[in-house]
Curated annotation (Swiss-Prot):
The keyword Ribonucleoprotein applies. It comes from the Bacteria. SUPFAM superfamilies: Ribosomal protein L25-like. One of its GO terms (cellular component) is cytosolic large ribosomal subunit. This is Large ribosomal subunit protein bL25. The gene is rplY. The lineage of its organism: Bacteria, Pseudomonadati, Pseudomonadota, Alphaproteobacteria, Hyphomicrobiales. The keyword 4Fe-4S does not apply. InterPro entries: Rbsml_bL25/Gln-tRNA_synth_N, Ribosomal_bL25/Gln-tRNA_synth, Ribosomal_bL25_b-dom, Ribosomal_bL25_C, Ribosomal_bL25_long, Ribosomal_L25_dom, Ribosomal_uL5_bac-type. Part of the 50S ribosomal subunit; part of the 5S rRNA/L5/L18/L25 subcomplex. Contacts the 5S rRNA. Binds to the 5S rRNA independently of L5 and L18.
Length: 211
């Protein structure tokens, strides 16, 4: 489960494109906190810190405790915009989170213990991944960093379905339980056949001289 992270912010009185450009010139990123039955709160964040948070991974699945004007607001990033040329953050949208609320998040799927899967280790099969991420409806306090799929004992022909995924308590998936997450498939070319073909191509043809 992702830990709640502290984040310092400064309240913004002015909004609009001109005000946003002025904020960026000061080395900060304009942002807004909305939802929770309250009026939107315009804030600004440190640009360097925001850049590191976005590119550090898991930004959109992390709950932040934002301190602004002596108040602490729990919120989760819903979206952010990047400069199309410099890839620097231009704006961040946060959603307030409250007790009993659930949020929709995209969580990565990690496939673990691949060396313990006979279909991959001994038979040189391939893991054909259909879903690298899955959409969860989950409590903000229970958002996982990732959903791990254990491949121990998996062989060629085995399929991992959505119903096989281990979810946090109270979480639900938007996908059909019977939908495929990944399958173990045979190698494109069998290792032995590929090796024999390589040897055949490398060996010079024998010729017999008649004397």
């Amino acid at each position: 489960m992702s830990a709640v992270k502290p984040l310092e912010a400064v309240a913004r009185d002015r909004v609009g494109k001109g005000a946003a450009r002025a904020v960026r010139r000061q080395g900060r990123v304009p942002a807004v906190i909305y939802g929770g039955g309250q009026s939107p709160q315009s804030i600004s964040l440190d640009a360097n810190q925001t850049h590191h948070l976005i590119y550090g991974g898991g930004f959109l699945t992390t709950v932040f405790e934002i301190e602004v004007g002596g108040r602490k607001i729990r919120a989760i990033p819903r979206d952010y915009q990047l400069d199309p040329v410099k890839d620097l953050p231009l704006h961040v949208d946060f959603l307030r989170v409250t007790a009993g609320q659930t949020v929709a998040v995209e969580v990565p799927v990690h496939f673990v213990n691949q060396d313990a899967a006979p279909g991959l280790k001994q038979k040189s099969g391939m893991l054909n991944v259909v879903h690298h991420t899955v959409a969860l409806e989950v409590s903000p306090d229970a958002i996982p960093d990732a959903i791990d799929v254990d491949l121990t004992g998996k062989d060629i022909g085995d399929t991992i379905h959505v119903s096989d995924l281990a979810l946090p308590a109270g979480a639900s998936l938007a996908l059909d339980p019977s939908e495929t997450v990944a399958t173990l498939v045979p190698p494109t070319v069998l290792p032995a056949a590929a090796e024999e073909a390589a040897v055949s191509e490398a060996a010079p043809a024998e010729t017999t001289k008649e004397g």
